């Protein structure tokens, strides 16, 4: 596996079929913001057969220091913890080599899900642990 910069077409094709798709992770959304003050990068983790296994877009600005935003989180199978861990490792290396000083991310997965009787139905704390391992720090969670 390796992390590469995807073309707009590669990213668009992947983002349209992914189950975690959201408007923040679309080419159209980045085109709106690119004209403002941001540059866009489409990053993907590919296997040996060039299949995209995970991807994200990074909006970056370079006003003295290089900062990035990952809106809507990654387009990845969050239930595959090994894949998420590998993606985070490679992404952190990419960000360091690309001289990013700060990157904020607002993932759209739920931390914990409860029913109306306050019984825990879904616990995604392991995802948070993986993100924390690579110094992605959460500021708030959605519990539903």
Placement of each model-derived feature along the sequence:
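Short amphipathic alpha-helix that is part of the acyltransferase structural core
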Residues: 1-29
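A structural signal for well-ordered alpha-helical scaffolds and beta->alpha junctions
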Residues: 4-8, 88, 124
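A general structural signal for well-ordered secondary-structure junctions
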Residues: 20-24, 101, 137
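Acyltransferase donor/substrate-recognition loop-hinge adjacent to the catalytic core
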Residues: 1-6, 53, 127-144
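Hydrophobic, Leu/Ile/Phe/Ala-enriched alpha-helical segments that form helix-helix packing faces
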Residues: 14-18, 91-95, 131
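Conserved donor-binding loop and adjoining core beta-sheet/short helix segment
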Residues: 32-120
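Residue-identity detector for threonine
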Residues: 7-9, 26, 30, 56, ...
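Alpha-helical transmembrane segments in multi-pass membrane proteins
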Residues: 120-127
């Amino acid at each position: 596996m390796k992390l590469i910069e995807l073309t707009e077409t590669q990213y668009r094709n992947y983002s349209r079929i992914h189950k975690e798709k959201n408007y923040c992770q679309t080419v159209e959304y980045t085109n709106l913001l690119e004209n403002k003050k941001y540059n866009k990068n489409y990053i993907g983790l590919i296997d040996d057969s060039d299949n995209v296994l995970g991807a994200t877009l990074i909006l970056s600005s370079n006003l003295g220091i290089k900062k990035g935003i990952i809106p809507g989180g990654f387009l990845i199978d969050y239930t595959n913890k090994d894949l998420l861990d590998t993606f985070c490792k490679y992404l952190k290396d990419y960000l360091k080599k690309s001289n990013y000083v700060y990157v904020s991310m607002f993932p759209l997965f739920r931390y914990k899900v409860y029913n109306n009787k306050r019984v825990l139905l879904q616990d995604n704390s392991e995802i948070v642990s993986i993100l924390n391992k690579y110094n992605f720090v959460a500021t708030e969670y959605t519990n539903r």
